[in-house]
């Protein structure tokens, strides 16, 4: 075995030393004029550019974020107590880079790639700039490969594809993060690499999220990038860009990547804080004038690459917080206009016990059925119609209106569909089981059962299939469509299932 130092083979270290250029270098230096609140004003850095990394004499790193005639504004990646007026600042003429690689999977890190989970050193495979150009039109291909969230409402009515950007928005405590975590948990079965970017989150929340991912076996294919409210604003500002850069590295290798930004409302607030500290001219609601560009540039980096570039994909799930259900405020409307659709979580539905509290009427996926398997398309169209009719007719019930039998039947069907769409946290369901569930609802197989027993019937029926007819589930998993033969089998098996399991309890 080769001798190692700090986990690296001796021959690699020797090679690096030989390759290093020891010749003198000309370096542009400046001096700190003023420092405070995580930002510094530096003079004499005349050749500095936006996004350049600089180093203070104490070793603290920073990034240039504003340019003036006689000085530049720098955000600090460390505590400003280690920087004082008159300190020397060294220009690097480089864009900030972050480490990435497979070694980061299963770890919790800060936006600079430093581990913060006590798990030891991470040896990167590469360093990548945090700011890259989005793939061009010619580098992309249409979004048509489905990304399964395991959430019935989303996979059936608001389908997401690899390479898409789908916004999740709603008030506080309505389940936005839960939807993102469930989507990550679902990816463990499909080999998708996940990156969860937590922006200004409490440490207790991060610990709970990491524990949830570990408990459900999804942490091993996930990188958690965490920033906290008491950290320098610079770390909170670069967090989504750093996560995106790491995701792009895997995408360029042909991998499918999912990145969650939780949340961009806090990121916008951080950018506003930094911009005001740097004395930049405020715009609407005191946000900088380029806040729209900042988020558009970030989210445009999500893409489905064509086969010439490896066919990788980066899917973005940004999260935004609304206040009192108002989605027409500045940041949410910006993000709605940038993304390829939104999933809106309704406080009233949440309080009524409907989980996930997705308002189907205000939610949309602009990719639509092109990112949905044929089997789901076969059942989802009827599902949406039944649900829409139910909610329309249910309004008349509130006024005690007399309804004919056909209308009552539609209402009863709608109640069962709505019950079927309810789903507990982290109860993700494979796509083939979802297709079967909706087939039963559409076909009227559940009409004779009380609403409160609908989910129990479906769960037991799927368990019955696994036990006696696993080939049906295997076919659906592989072919993802309801052929005539499979429909015939599902129908006959359900009759057999009823006789064996529900012979004496139907309708009770």
Curated annotation (Swiss-Prot):
Please state the Enzyme Commission number of this protein. Answer: 7.1.2.2
Top-tier EC class: translocase
**Site (Required for activity) location in chain:** 363
| Name of a matching Pfam family | ATP-synt_ab_N
Give the top-rank taxon of the lineage listed in the UniProt record for this protein. Bacteria
Name the predominant localization: membrane
Q: Where in the cell is it found?
A: Cell inner membrane
Q: Could you give one GO CC term from the UniProt record?
A: proton-transporting ATP synthase complex
Give the reaction(s) catalysed. ATP + H2O + 4 H(+)(in) = ADP + phosphate + 5 H(+)(out)
What's an example of a GO molecular-function annotation for this chain? Answer: ADP binding
Full protein name: ATP synthase subunit alpha
What species is this protein from?
Dictyoglomus turgidum (strain DSM 6724 / Z-1310)
Subunit structure, per the record?
A: F-type ATPases have 2 components, CF(1) - the catalytic core - and CF(0) - the membrane proton channel. CF(1) has five subunits: alpha(3), beta(3), gamma(1), delta(1), epsilon(1). CF(0) has three main subunits: a(1), b(2) and c(9-12). The alpha and beta chains form an alternating ring which encloses part of the gamma chain. CF(1) is attached to CF(0) by a central stalk formed by the gamma and epsilon chains, while a peripheral stalk is formed by the delta and b chains.
Q: What topology does it adopt in the membrane? A: Peripheral membrane protein
Which residues bind ATP per the record?
170-177
Q: Record's HAMAP family?
A: ATP_synth_alpha_bact
Q: Gene name, please?
A: atpA
Q: What does this protein do?
A: Produces ATP from ADP in the presence of a proton gradient across the membrane. The alpha chain is a regulatory subunit.
What keywords appear on the UniProt entry? ATP synthesis, ATP-binding, Cell inner membrane, Cell membrane, CF(1), Hydrogen ion transport, Ion transport, Membrane, Nucleotide-binding, Translocase, Transport
- A GO biological-process term: proton motive force-driven ATP synthesis
Its family remark reads: Belongs to the ATPase alpha/beta chains family.
């Amino acid at each position: 075995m080769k001798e190692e130092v700090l986990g690296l083979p001796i021959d690699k270290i020797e090679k690096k030393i030989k390759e290093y250029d020891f010749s003198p270098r000309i370096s542009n230096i400046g001096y700190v004029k003023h420092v405070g609140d995580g930002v510094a004003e530096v003079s004499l850095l005349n050749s500095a550019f936006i996004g350049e990394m600089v180093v203070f004499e104490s070793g603290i790193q920073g990034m240039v974020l504003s340019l003036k005639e006689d000085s530049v504004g720098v955000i600090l990646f460390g505590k400003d107590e280690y920087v004082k007026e008159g300190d020397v600042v060294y220009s690097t003429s480089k864009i900030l880079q972050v480490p990435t690689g497979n070694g980061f999977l299963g770890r919790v890190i800060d936006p600079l790639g430093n581990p913060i989970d006590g798990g030891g050193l991470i040896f990167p495979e590469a360093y990548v700039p945090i700011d890259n150009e989005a793939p061009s039109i010619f580098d992309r291909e249409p979004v048509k490969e489905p990304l399964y969230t395991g959430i019935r409402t989303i996979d059936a009515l608001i389908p997401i594809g690899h390479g898409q950007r789908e916004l999740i928005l709603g008030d506080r405590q309505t389940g936005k993060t839960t939807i993102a975590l469930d989507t990550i948990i679902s990816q463990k079965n499909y080999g998708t690499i996940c990156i969860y970017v937590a922006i200004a989150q409490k440490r207790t929340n991060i610990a709970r999220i990491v524990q949830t991912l570990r408990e459900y076996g999804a942490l091993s294919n996930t990188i958690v990038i965490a920033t906290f409210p008491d950290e320098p604003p610079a770390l909170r500002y670069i967090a989504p860009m750093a996560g995106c850069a790491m995701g792009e590295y895997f995408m360029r290798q042909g991998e499918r990547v999912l990145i969650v930004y939780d949340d961009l409302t806090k990121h916008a607030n951080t950018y506003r804080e930094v911009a005001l500290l740097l004395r930049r001219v405020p715009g609407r609601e005191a946000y900088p004038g380029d806040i729209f560009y900042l988020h558009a540039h970030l989210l445009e980096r999500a893409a489905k690459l064509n086969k010439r570039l490896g066919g990788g994909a980066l899917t973005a799930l940004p999260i935004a917080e609304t206040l009192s259900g108002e989605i027409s405020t500045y940041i949410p409307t910006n993000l709605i206009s940038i993304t390829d659709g939104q999933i809106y979580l309704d406080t009233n539905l949440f309080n009524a016990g409907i989980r996930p509290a997705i308002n189907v009427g205000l939610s949309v996926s602009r990719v639509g059925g092109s990112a949905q398997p044929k089997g789901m398309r076969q059942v989802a169209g009827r599902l949406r119609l039944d649900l829409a009719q139910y909610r329309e007719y249910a309004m008349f019930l509130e006024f005690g209106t007399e309804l004919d039998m056909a209308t009552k039947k539609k209402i009863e069907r709608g109640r069962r569909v709505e019950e079927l769409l309810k789903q507990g946290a982290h109860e993700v369901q494979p796509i083939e089981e979802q297709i079967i569930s909706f087939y039963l609802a559409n076909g009227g197989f559940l009409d004779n059962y009380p609403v409160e027993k609908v989910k129990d019937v479906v769960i037991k029926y799927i368990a019955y299939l696994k036990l006696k007819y696993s080939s049906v589930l295997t076919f659906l998993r592989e072919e993802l469509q309801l052929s005539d033969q499979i429909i015939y089998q599902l129908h006959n098996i359900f009759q057999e299932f009823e006789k064996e399991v529900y012979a004496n309890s139907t309708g009770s």
